[in-house]
């Protein structure tokens, strides 16, 4: 009966959406000459999560005109490959995946692929849909450490709740391992959030993992959206009750595309920002967009240009516009307009996998996350890890600057001391083990708090070639690789310990490739050759004080120019113990208010 009800809901959606989708498709602009030479109040470069959220918010005022320029197209209705979260990964390698390639990495001399959505909705089209929030101390540090007034947990939480249309789990889902604290969630928002449920029975393995953890004093079955993500619990997803993905285009564009003051241009990319340099401070007055060095156009902004192209692309747009480090710009022949550390401070995480075959008694659906503290991750090796934290920060900062991941050792040391405080004094979670029980016990895991820093920089003066170097410098910090190894070792241990032994039917990954009694150092050797990017890169246009290496201020305004902001995932100055969608949505709402405040001050 449960499965039948779910299927009937899916049929309703399948018959209800096509006309709206068709109307939206027909309303989108594909001819660049329709906007070339015209003027809008705001131009948004990128139609992803933050771009569409801010566009929807600004155009609530019918007097504000907005143009969104997106390289991709409307893809929300492409079918299960996007709409069904259980098809996660199937879309990779298609036209909806930007699939950025790193340079050959120093750790193993191979390139890695960084997945990122291309299309209206951005990475909300291709991600796993997980819905958690970071630790309070992490967001608080944006204000207390990095000088961003108004950026703390208490100020950001209302914005994160505002966008939610959250559903509490039902009794069966709670019995399987869900927990929901209504005080931490909003119910009147736009983004649908709730339990993922295929209609199948739930695996007993989640509760067995919880029982083992509880016996060790680790919290279980908690709401991971309340500011202290720690322990094991099933998690919410951005998904409708009928299990359709709640992506940004479906929620922020589909209801609003008919607004006469909102225009969406697809199939085009923003190459650079246009500046009026006749004033004392350069002022953004539009963008150059197109597809080719010989086929590009200008469009003008009456008030502001807003960059929302993501942590890999927004810094490239700035550099092509003359905003960045002189050495980088000189290398490609771009005249420097403003000196800022654009493209530095890149922080992404690394993922490895531990996978076990299971007996039939473990069968069933289920996804959960284990957010493990520093000491839980390292176990009896914690003293070794603490020794690194207590003795190596200055050396690490020097190494990062020498490799081009940051520009100032003293400023980077502030970041490192902040991270040490999180891990030692605040018990901020250091690793996440993501648990999936569908047909197996699959544990994907990552070190949440990397100390390494990388960069993204342009390699050509032509923005439409999109030639750039993306180097996250994975595992060039000894604590990063040790932490990844420790989390992997922990994942293997929890797969076949206590109550979990009854389900265990042999290990598939790493299996025979790594001895079962492998030491932590053996795991270090293993993870160096067996990892991928986690696709959570942040920091390349960091929001922090200029003295600490910031590119934008607390209102997301680019330092040293007027009428230009960066509003996407490149601005968080730190990594977070969370899946990042919730924070990006909250940021978009908060920055929208700053934009509107400046607009109202101008027109009034």
Curated annotation (Swiss-Prot):
Quaternary state and interactors: Homodimer.
Catalysed reaction equations from the record: beta-D-glucose + O2 = D-glucono-1,5-lactone + H2O2
Family: Belongs to the GMC oxidoreductase family.
Subcellular localization, as worded in the UniProt entry: Secreted; Secreted, Cell wall; Cytoplasm; Secreted, Extracellular space, Extracellular matrix
Keywords: Cell wall, Cytoplasm, Disulfide bond, Extracellular matrix, FAD, Flavoprotein, Glycoprotein, Oxidoreductase, Secreted, Signal, Virulence
Residues holding FAD: 49-50, 70, 123, 127-128, 130, 270, 569, 581
Chain positions carrying an annotated carbohydrate: 63, 109, 214, 375, 408, 517, 600
Physiological role: Glucose oxidase catalyzes the oxidation of beta-D-glucose to D-glucono-delta-lactone and hydrogen peroxide in the presence of molecular oxygen. D-glucono-delta-lactone is sequentially hydrolyzed by lactonase to D-gluconic acid, and the resulting hydrogen peroxide is hydrolyzed by catalase to oxygen and water. Acts as a key factor contributing to fungal disease of apple. The production of gluconic acid leads to host tissue acidification that enhances the expression of pectolytic enzymes and the establishment of conditions for necrotrophic development of P.expansum.
Gene Ontology terms, MF aspect: flavin adenine dinucleotide binding; oxidoreductase activity, acting on CH-OH group of donors
Any one GO BP annotation for this protein: secondary metabolite biosynthetic process
Cysteines engaged in disulfide bonds, as pairs: 184-226
Main location: secreted
Entry protein name: Glucose oxidase 2
EC number: 1.1.3.4
Induction, per UniProt: Expression is negatively controlled by decreasing oxygen levels. Expression is highest at pH 7.0 and decreases by 68, 83, and 89% at pH 9.0, 5.0, and 4.0, respectively.
Active site per database record: 536
PROSITE patterns given in the database record: GMC_OXRED_1, GMC_OXRED_2
């Amino acid at each position: 009966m449960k499965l039948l009800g779910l299927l009937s809901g899916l049929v309703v959606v399948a018959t209800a959406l096509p006309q709206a989708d068709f109307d939206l498709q027909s309303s989108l602009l594909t001819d660049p000459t329709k906007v070339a030479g015209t003027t809008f109040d705001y131009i948004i470069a990128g139609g992803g999560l933050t771009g569409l959220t801010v566009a929807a918010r600004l155009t609530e005022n019918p007097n504000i005109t907005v143009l969104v320029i997106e390289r991709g197209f409307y893809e929300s209705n492409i079918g299960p490959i996007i709409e069904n979260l259980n098809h996660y990964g199937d879309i990779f390698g298609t036209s909806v995946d930007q699939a950025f390639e790193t340079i050959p990495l120093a750790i193993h001399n191979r390139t890695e692929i960084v997945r990122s959505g291309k299309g209206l909705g951005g990475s909300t089209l291709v991600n796993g849909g997980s819905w958690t929030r970071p630790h309070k101390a992490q967001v608080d540090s944006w204000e207390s450490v990095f000088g961003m007034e108004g950026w703390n947990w208490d100020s950001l939480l209302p914005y994160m709740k505002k966008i939610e249309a959250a559903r509490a789990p039902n009794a069966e889902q709670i019995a399987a391992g869900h927990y929901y604290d209504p005080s931490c969630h909003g119910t009147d928002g736009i983004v649908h959030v709730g339990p993922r449920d295929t209609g199948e029975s739930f695996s007993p393995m989640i509760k067995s993992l919880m029982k083992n953890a509880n016996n060790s004093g680790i919290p279980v079955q908690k709401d991971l959206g309340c500011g202290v993500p720690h322990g094991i619990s099933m998690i919410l997803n951005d998904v409708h009750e009928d299990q359709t993905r709640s992506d940004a285009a479906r929620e922020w564009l589909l209801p609003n595309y008919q607004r006469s003051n909102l225009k969406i241009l697809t199939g085009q990319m923003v190459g650079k920002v246009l500046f009026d340099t006749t004033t004392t401070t350069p002022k953004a007055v539009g963008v150059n967009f197109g597809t080719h060095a010989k086929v590009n156009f200008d469009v003008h902004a009456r008030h502001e240009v807003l960059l929302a192209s993501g942590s890999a692309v927004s810094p490239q747009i700035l550099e092509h516009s003359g905003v960045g480090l002189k050495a980088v710009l000189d290398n490609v022949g771009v005249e420097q307009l403003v000196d800022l550390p654009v493209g530095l401070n890149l922080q992404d995480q690394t993922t490895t996998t531990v996978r076990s075959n299971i007996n039939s008694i473990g069968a069933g659906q289920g996804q959960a996350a284990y957010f493990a503290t520093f000491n839980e991750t390292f176990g009896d090796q914690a003293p070794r890890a603490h020794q690194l934290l207590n003795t190596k920060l200055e050396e690490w900062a020097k190494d990062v600057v020498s490799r081009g991941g940051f520009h100032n050792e003293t400023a980077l040391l502030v970041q490192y001391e902040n991270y040490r405080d999180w891990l030692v004094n605040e018990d901020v979670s250091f690793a996440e083990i993501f648990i999936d029980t569908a047909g197996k016990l699959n544990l994907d895991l990552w070190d949440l708090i990397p100390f390494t820093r990388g960069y993204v920089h342009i390699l050509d003066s032509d923005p439409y070639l999109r030639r750039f170097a993306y180097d996250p410098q994975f595992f060039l910090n000894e604590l990063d690789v040790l932490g990844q190894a420790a989390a992997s070792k922990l994942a293997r241990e929890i797969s076949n310990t206590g109550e979990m032994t009854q389900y265990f039917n042999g290990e598939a990954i790493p299996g025979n490739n790594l001895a079962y009694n492998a030491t932590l150092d053996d795991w270090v050797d293993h993870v160096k050759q067996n990892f991928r990017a986690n696709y959570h890169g942040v920091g390349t246009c960091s929001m922090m004080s200029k003295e600490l290496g910031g590119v934008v201020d607390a209102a997301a305004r680019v330092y040293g120019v007027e009428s230009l902001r960066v509003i996407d995932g490149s601005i968080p100055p730190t990594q977070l113990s969370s899946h990042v969608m919730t924070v990006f949505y909250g940021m978009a709402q908060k920055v929208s208010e700053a934009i509107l405040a400046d607009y109202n001050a101008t027109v009034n």
